[in-house]
């Protein structure tokens, strides 16, 4: 059986939000709890590494016990950028691991069904894959100075990318190591693998698997929760 480690990235500074968005309560528990719990409840994920800010280390040590999240076996300090945080987690893996599944702590609404679908695809095909949804709106390239439209992109080939993202362990570790050596900063983990010429595939995700980034996202979240059972 393949050994899978989950990495939950909770080391962001929430600059755009104005407060620690991960601690905002949803039905009595903070956002971060649900993001970890989704991975925790999947039997194929053996262990979880939680990446946190230094000033939150003691808080999470206590809460992981309170929340009975036994699969969280290690807390790792984050870096300056998200990419640094993930690399710190990858370096901390101290046992044989076949795959790594990386998830943003600010995405509490991903379904267990979709995570399991992602795991099945990767392990059965020995491939890397990520969740994403097709773009529905028209996307244009705009000159930020003049605001002139430069190009209209073919949306039939465009996808909005989400997490979790899953990779064979040695591939994602090498991709992060290479990016660090070459001072390359990608917008997600998959972009680091892509630049090595290694294929990454997309599994269609769900529109409600949004990343809570601004107060507007919170309003959207509250509206959805009033009508559903996403957590």
Curated annotation (Swiss-Prot):
Enzyme Commission code: 2.7.7.60
MF terms in GO: 2-C-methyl-D-erythritol 4-phosphate cytidylyltransferase activity
Positions MEP for the nucleophilic attack (site feature) positions: 155, 211
GO process terms (BP): isopentenyl diphosphate biosynthetic process, methylerythritol 4-phosphate pathway
Pathway assignment: Isoprenoid biosynthesis; isopentenyl diphosphate biosynthesis via DXP pathway; isopentenyl diphosphate from 1-deoxy-D-xylulose 5-phosphate: step 2/6
UniProt keywords, alphabetically: Isoprene biosynthesis, Nucleotidyltransferase, Transferase
InterPro entries in the record: IspD, IspD/TarI, IspD/TarI_cytidylyltransf_bact, ISPD_synthase_CS, Nucleotide-diphossugar_trans
Superkingdom assignment: Bacteria
KW Nucleotidyltransferase (keyword) present: yes
The protein's name in its UniProt record: 2-C-methyl-D-erythritol 4-phosphate cytidylyltransferase
Disulfide linkage: none
UniProt similarity note: Belongs to the IspD/TarI cytidylyltransferase family. IspD subfamily.
Name of the encoding gene: ispD
HAMAP family named in the record: IspD
Catalytic reaction(s) noted: 2-C-methyl-D-erythritol 4-phosphate + CTP + H(+) = 4-CDP-2-C-methyl-D-erythritol + diphosphate
Transmembrane regions: none
Residues the record marks as site: Transition state stabilizer: 16, 21
Annotated PANTHER family: 2-C-METHYL-D-ERYTHRITOL 4-PHOSPHATE CYTIDYLYLTRANSFERASE, CHLOROPLASTIC
Functional note: Catalyzes the formation of 4-diphosphocytidyl-2-C-methyl-D-erythritol from CTP and 2-C-methyl-D-erythritol 4-phosphate (MEP).
């Amino acid at each position: 059986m393949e050994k899978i480690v989950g990495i939950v990235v909770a080391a962001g500074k929430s600059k755009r939000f104005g407060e620690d968005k991960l601690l905002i309560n949803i039905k009595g528990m903070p956002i971060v709890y649900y993001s970890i719990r989704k991975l925790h409840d999947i039997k194929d994920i053996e262990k979880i590494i939680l990446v946190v800010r230094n000033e939150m280390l003691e808080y999470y040590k206590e809460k992981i016990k309170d929340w009975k999240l036994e699969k969280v076996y290690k807390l790792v300090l984050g870096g300056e950028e998200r990419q640094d945080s993930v690399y710190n987690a990858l370096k901390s893996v101290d046992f044989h691991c076949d795959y790594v599944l990386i998830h943003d702590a600010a995405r509490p609404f991903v379904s267990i069904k979709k995570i399991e679908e992602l795991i099945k695809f990767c392990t059965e095909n020995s491939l890397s894959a990520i969740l994403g949804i097709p773009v529905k709106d028209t996307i244009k390239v705009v000159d930020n100075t003049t605001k002139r439209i430069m190009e209209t992109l073919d949306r039939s080939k465009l996808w909005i990318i989400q997490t979790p993202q899953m990779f064979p362990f040695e591939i994602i570790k090498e991709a992060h190591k290479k990016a660090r050596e070459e001072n390359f900063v990608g917008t997600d983990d998959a972009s680091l693998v892509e630049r090595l010429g290694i294929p990454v595939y997309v599994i269609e995700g769900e529109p409600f698997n949004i990343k809570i980034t601004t107060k507007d996202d919170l309003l959207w979240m509250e509206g959805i929760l009033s009508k559903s059972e996403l957590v």
